[in-house]
A protein has these predicted regions:
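Core helices of alpha-solenoid repeat scaffolds
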Residues: 6, 38, 68, 98-99, ...
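Short, Lys/Arg-enriched, disordered terminal segments
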Residues: 1-4, 11
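Hydrophobic secondary-structure block in the mid-to-C-terminal portion of proteins
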Residues: 138, 142-160
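Alpha-solenoid HEAT/Armadillo-like helical repeat scaffolds in large eukaryotic proteins
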Residues: 8-16, 40-48, 70-78, 101-109, ...
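Structural detector for internal amphipathic alpha-helices that build alpha-solenoid repeat scaffolds
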Residues: 1, 19-34, 43, 51-66, ...
């Protein structure tokens, strides 16, 4: 159940009519660091507003790996901007549960920004505690694929 502070922050977001108000409302939600805010922060990624999405992304990253399952099931397949932000969060969190989504994004997404973020995610996935050689192989295969991508930003992400 959402706290009174979180409920008030959600209401502030709903009332926002400008970018500045959206940023402030999203900052208020993110600052609470409440896991119940994750779905709203994910929804904000789809507002097609980079300033707001950046704040929401940082809020999701601060929530940590606990948000990974919500990221995996709330991906907006019709909004490449939102997909890019979600993939960026997954890449930053380095959680191996994102492997399948990162692979799919690299192989099938039309947007170079999504493929680039997926490439970085595959390169930086935290497999140190994993004894899963298959996951490491899949990451390497993905990076090799990214190295042959038509877009230089994706190839660059694979190389560096």
């Amino acid at each position: 159940m959402a706290t009174a502070e979180l409920t008030a922050a959600f209401a502030r977001l709903d009332r926002a009519t400008s970018t500045a108000e959206l940023v402030q409302a999203t900052q208020a939600i993110a600052s609470l660091q409440d896991p119940e805010a994750a779905e709203t922060l994910i929804k904000v990624l789809g507002f097609n507003n980079p300033a707001v999405a950046s704040v929401a992304t940082e809020g999701l990253i601060r929530l940590g790996c606990a948000v990974v399952p919500k990221l995996l099931v709330n991906l907006d397949a019709r909004n490449y901007g939102a997909r890019a932000w979600v993939v960026k969060v997954l890449a930053t969190l380095r959680d191996p549960r994102g492997l399948e989504l990162l692979e799919h994004a690299l192989q099938a997404d039309i947007a170079p920004s999504v493929r680039r973020a997926a490439t970085r995610g595959l390169a930086e996935l935290d497999l140190n505690n994993s004894r899963d050689a298959d996951a490491l192989r899949r990451c390497c295969d993905g990076l090799l694929l990214a190295g042959r991508d038509d877009e230089w930003v994706v190839r660059y992400a694979a190389a560096f």
